[in-house]
Swiss-Prot record:
It is found in: Plastid, Chloroplast. This is Large ribosomal subunit protein bL20c. Its main location: plastid. Gene3D superfamilies: 6.10.160.10, Ribosomal protein L20. InterPro entries: Ribosomal_bL20 (IPR005813), RIBOSOMAL_L20_CS (IPR049946), Ribosomal_protein_bL20_C (IPR035566). It comes from the Eukaryota. It comes from Gnetum parvifolium (Small-leaved jointfir). GO terms for cellular component: chloroplast; ribonucleoprotein complex; ribosome. The lineage of its organism: Eukaryota, Viridiplantae, Streptophyta, Embryophyta, Tracheophyta. GO terms for molecular function: rRNA binding; structural constituent of ribosome. Keywords: Chloroplast, Plastid, Ribonucleoprotein, Ribosomal protein, RNA-binding, rRNA-binding. Belongs to the bacterial ribosomal protein bL20 family. GO terms for biological process: ribosomal large subunit assembly; translation.
Amino acid sequence: MTRVKRGFIARRRRNKILTFASGFQGSHSKQFRVAKQQKKRALISAERDRMKRKRDFRRLWIARINAAVRFSGLSYSQFVYCMYKNRLSQNRKNLAQIATLCTPFFSTFSQKIMT
């Protein structure tokens, strides 16, 4: 059987993974086997945390809207129900920005929705 010299291809594959892991600490950035495992873990964590970030921001927006709506004597769920009843659709991100930046406008808006 003939000898297969695949140094370039193998080296390119290893260098690609080691370059990805270059910011990791200790042997996680130096040794190929460890770096390969850490790259796998890093990509899994990155995907998980991207999904978690969406949940966290939604919770933050709801908390901000709820805090602003409480001044009008409503709860968040009542506010959303009033918006649904009046056929108003606005996403939570925009509502939270309005609630934090334009508080007087948001309070009059929530009062109008209530009636």
